Structures are given as structure tokens and as C-alpha cells.
Amino acid sequence: MRNAIFATPLVSDFFRQYWRFLWRVGACRGVYANYREASKACAAFKKHGYNDALFYGPAIIGEPVHMRKRDYPVLYWLSQSLKEGTRILNLGGNAGTEYFTYRQFIHFPDGVRWIVWELPAAVNFGQHLAQVSKSPDLSFTTRLEDGDGADIVLVAGALQYIEEDLPTCLKRLSALPPRLVIHRTPLYEGETFFTMQSTYGSVVPYRIQNRQELADSLLKLGYRMVDCWCEQRSVIIPFYPARSSDRFYGFYFVLDDSPDPTWKTDAIETAMEVRKQIRHPWSN
């Protein structure tokens, strides 16, 4: 009987909303029109925001790295794009998580520069890691403009936490980067909104964006979608079932001065078809 009661939608949502929210990493609460509203709601909690060393300290060098199948598209496109002197701008790259992980699986040619744009707490810890690991090709900054001249922009699991949307971030650079790799981003078919997410004892704003809106915003900048991938992974917003997302997406875009018009219509579906024709090393 007790299990049946907790299985009912209303009781289940109430349990997630008020009982488990602060104690369950990744739990979400509320729907807000923009980042400012969500941030204001987060401020009602004793601990809020991302600028805390607690979020970055666990990224310790030397621990075993276990790749997941979802990460292989990123490895593939990076391996196809890296060449001598390539500059990578890693948006929200924590304390170098992607750098330390990916370099164990793909070759970094001479002169590759990996720049992480992050909050001060991540930058401080990341600089320490770069020093102790003797990684002169890894640097950190709180200034997005320090990424000027980037050949690749990589954002993996961080786009949903950044106040500005991706086109706005890209326009702050002196020139649009030729390649974009987007990974682990929650998207759905409804209207873009923000919610609050519980993360290691803190509460932070969290964006869930309309899938086609994200793609179209980059196509309008002149990018061409080459690949798209997704995984089934849920973000549940209690009391707002229509706002919940059940998939995280990844994309590979290239800047195209003369885009083929066929890429402008149903871009995501087109990329999915192209993906079937690409022989990835993990698809055997």
C-alpha cells in the first residue's frame, strides 16, 4: 500500500520536490523564464552557485578514467580536427576534466593549446593541476575573450549551466571558431526555460533548451551541422511533466561560408542520416 501511494504522480512529485531535492544530486525544482529568475530563486537557499572549490577538487590526476560510449563521438571529431598548433576553447571545462580524460585516448599534436573558460574556483584549482601534471599546453581563464583565435570550441555537459546562450558566447570572440563540439546537453521539444538543480549541496540555475532552437541559432551564424548524437537520460521537473527532458544531445558543427541550403531544413534529422553513413571506429 505504501509503495502504491508513493507511485502516484502527485505524491511522487511532492516527494521529489520537497524531500529529496537538496539531498539528491541532479534533482530539479521549479520553472523559470530566464537565468536571472532562476538565480534569484536559488539565492533563497543557504548554499547556491557554482563558484565553490567543492565542485572542482575531485578532479584528481592519476585516477582511472573510464570512457563511456556516449563520449566516443567527441573523441572521433576531436581526433579528426586536431593538428599542429590547434587552439581549443573549452567552455565550462571544470578543472580540465575533458583535457585530462581525452588526452589518454587521442593524440595531441605538437603546439596544441587547450584553454578552459571557467569560474575563479575552477581556474585556481585547474592552474594547480596543470602545474603539478606538467601540462604547459593547458591554461585557464575567467575571460572568454582570452579564447580569441580558437579553432575549436568544446562544451561538454556545461552549456546548461552557462548564463549566456552559445551564440552569445561565440559572438564575444573576435572571430567565429571554425568548429563546434557540443556534448551532454539536455534538450526537448518545448519552450526554453530554466530550473533549479541540486548539485553537491548547492543549488544552481539549469537551462533546458528547445532542441531546434539551439540548432537554428547556430545555423544562422553560418555553421553547418555534420553530426548529431543523443542518449536517453532524464531530467524530471516535479509538477511540470511537459517540461521534463528525456534525452541529452551532442553535435558537431563546422563553419561554412557557403552553406548548402539542404542543411537549413530539418537540420537535426539530416545530420542523423549523415551520421549513418559515417563509419565511426566504435560502431563495429
Where are the predicted features?
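Conserved class I S-adenosyl-L-methionine
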Residues: 85-95
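Class I SAM-dependent methyltransferase SAM/SAH-binding core
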Residues: 93-139
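A short, conserved alpha-helix within the catalytic core of class I
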Residues: 161-176
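Short alpha-helix
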Residues: 204-229
